[in-house]
């Protein structure tokens, strides 16, 4: 039973990481006028193929490269900021509860893994993207 509870806590941490990542994209789609409600995102229970949902594709296609790049990086930026906040919280709040510690450590690790995965394995190339930002 303890193992099942740990799996559920880890799943919840992963779900929350993906939800926050998608909210990062969604917020900037909304800010650039491609979405009516930035809170509405789709994160499926099986976690794959999550999207910022309900994006006006016609408006999104007309975005400048710089705006499109900001939207692309918004998800990993949220992951990095949230991981940093969780590290600070973990530093100041120490718990004797093994489940709270598991959640916090999983949450920090998964946020960092999510960001690193997109930076290293994904189709994001920092050098070429920085050129777009500087234009």
Listing of model-derived features with the role each one plays in the protein:
Residues 1-18, 79-95:
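Long, highly hydrophobic alpha-helical transmembrane signal-anchor segments
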Residues 9-64:
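Small-residue-rich helix-interface/hinge motifs
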Residues 55-135:
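Metalloprotease/metallohydrolase-associated module, dominated by Zn2+-dependent proteases
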């Amino acid at each position: 039973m303890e193992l099942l509870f740990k799996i559920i806590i880890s799943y919840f941490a992963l779900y929350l990481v993906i939800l926050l990542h998608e909210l990062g994209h969604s917020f900037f789609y909304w800010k650039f006028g491609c979405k009516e409600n930035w809170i509405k995102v789709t994160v499926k229970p099986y976690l794959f193929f999550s999207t910022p949902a309900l994006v006006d594709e016609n408006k999104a296609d007309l975005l400048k490269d710089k705006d499109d790049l900001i939207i692309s990086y918004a998800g990993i930026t949220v992951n990095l900021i949230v991981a940093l906040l969780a590290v600070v919280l973990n530093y100041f709040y120490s718990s004797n509860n093994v489940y709270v510690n598991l959640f916090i450590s999983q949450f920090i690790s998964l946020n960092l893994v999510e960001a690193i995965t997109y930076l290293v394995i994904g189709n994001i190339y920092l050098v070429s993207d920085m050129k777009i930002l500087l234009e």
